[in-house]
Amino acid sequence: MVKLNSNPSEKGTKPPSVEDGFQTVPLITPLEVNHLQLPAPEKVIVKTRTEYQPEQKNKGKFRVPKIAEFTVTILVSLALAFLACIVFLVVYKAFTYDHSCPEGFVYKHKRCIPASLDAYYSSQDPNSRSRFYTVISHYSVAKQSTARAIGPWLSAAAVIHEPKPPKTQGH
């Protein structure tokens, strides 16, 4: 405890009195330098990595981590291959999924074909199916060519119903 109203410089000059009620045990004891540090060894031995390797080979634990890493690598690669197969199958099924067609149509060769045309061409010879697709492709090409011939700036009705100028009889 610290005594109130006392000057620290007077502490050493005035002998402590019993009336103060404080014990006379010093708070700080002097330290000796010999107790602070351990004596330094005269010879220091530094063990290197090469000294530890023969010990590890003798223990037999050196092979265990390699086998564990190898099996983990195999398991991870098998899991990735399995996931790749699943993704491939999902994508394959998405592209080859049987698409629904409106009523009266049949899905053949990635197209919706009217059922009556499919029945008609299936009763014909086997080459008729290729002729059917040829007719469809020519129809779409012809449809595009007539639209281009008119011109995008003119309407189709204006070209068809355009009044012709009267012919004048020449001299």
Curated annotation (Swiss-Prot):
Keyword presence, Repressor:
no
Q: Which positions form S-S bridges? A: none
Q: How does it sit in the membrane?
A: Single-pass type II membrane protein
Record keywords, A-Z: Cell projection, Cytoplasmic vesicle, Endosome, Golgi apparatus, Lysosome, Membrane, Signal-anchor, Transmembrane, Transmembrane helix
Share an example GO biological-process annotation for this protein: clathrin coat assembly
> Where does this protein chiefly localize?
membrane
TM spans (from-to)? 72-92
Q: Name one Pfam family in it.
A: Calcyon
Q: Name one GO molecular function term.
A: clathrin light chain binding
Cytoplasmic side of the membrane: what ranges? 1-71
Give the family per the record: Belongs to the NSG family.
Bias type Polar residues, positions: 1-10
Name assigned to this protein: Neuronal vesicle trafficking-associated protein 2
Membrane-side (Lumenal) residue stretches: 93-171
Q: Where is this region: Disordered?
A: 1-21
Q: Where in the cell does this protein reside? A: Membrane; Golgi apparatus, trans-Golgi network membrane; Cell projection, Dendrite; Endosome membrane
A single GO cellular-component term on record = late endosome
